[in-house]
């Protein structure tokens, strides 16, 4: 397995009160899989992603990537945030290379290959201020892929983009996934996006965050949002998502 996750509990203590964010999370993600995570606000999706990334180690449980325990950030995990977080004083190719020497022929070759993959050929010397939001996010994706991570973690990477750019970048991401065969885990609030991208989909419930439903998406790529099969799966996901909201209301009301 590429990623195995076993979290008994992740909790915060605030003003003497314990707030359990995640509880009894068990996931096994195969190499090359594209898992999408969806759930209501406050269900711990982003917290789970940070735990897998090694950015949060204060929990009861374990995370392994190809048999190695995750205790801190490392080159085996790539992380993409909603904001691109590019360095404004660096060009596109310099941002992708980050702390590696762009004058090294091997580094330059990898950077050039990634620029081609994320469809930014011709913009190598541009600065972030000269890029659109979608272009900036493509630079961030290329930067995360430079060290060839075993798992790419994406925390709502297209959430701040307009609908047209968002759909375009979804196709770019799928193209990268097919070419690089990198295991991907993407957090989203968008049901359409979760069905369009993932070959496996996990729905979380909140308070505390738990896996409500794990669903394989048996649709061939490339996917067409207008087909009856796509719409049927989307409706199933929506129905399960609505159940998590009903559960939250019932538990909060003591029903």
UniProtKB/Swiss-Prot annotation:
CDD domains: ABC_NrtD_SsuB_transporters (cd03293). It is an enzyme of class 7 (translocase). It is found in: Cell membrane. It is a peripheral membrane protein. Induction: Repressed by sulfate and cysteine. Its EC number is 7.6.2.14. One of its GO terms (molecular function) is ATP hydrolysis activity. Pfam families: ABC_tran. GO terms for cellular component: plasma membrane. ATP binds at residues 39-46. The keyword Signal does not apply. It catalyses: ATP + H2O + aliphatic sulfonate-[sulfonate-binding protein]Side 1 = ADP + phosphate + aliphatic sulfonateSide 2 + [sulfonate-binding protein]Side 1. SUPFAM superfamilies: P-loop containing nucleoside triphosphate hydrolases. Residues 7-231 form the ABC transporter domain. Keywords: ATP-binding, Cell membrane, Membrane, Nucleotide-binding, Translocase, Transport. The keyword ATP-binding applies. The complex is composed of two ATP-binding proteins (SsuB), two transmembrane proteins (SsuC) and a solute-binding protein (SsuA). Belongs to the ABC transporter superfamily. Aliphatic sulfonates importer (TC 3.A.1.17.2) family. Part of the ABC transporter complex SsuABC involved in aliphatic sulfonates import. Responsible for energy coupling to the transport system. Is also involved in taurine transport. This is Aliphatic sulfonates import ATP-binding protein SsuB.
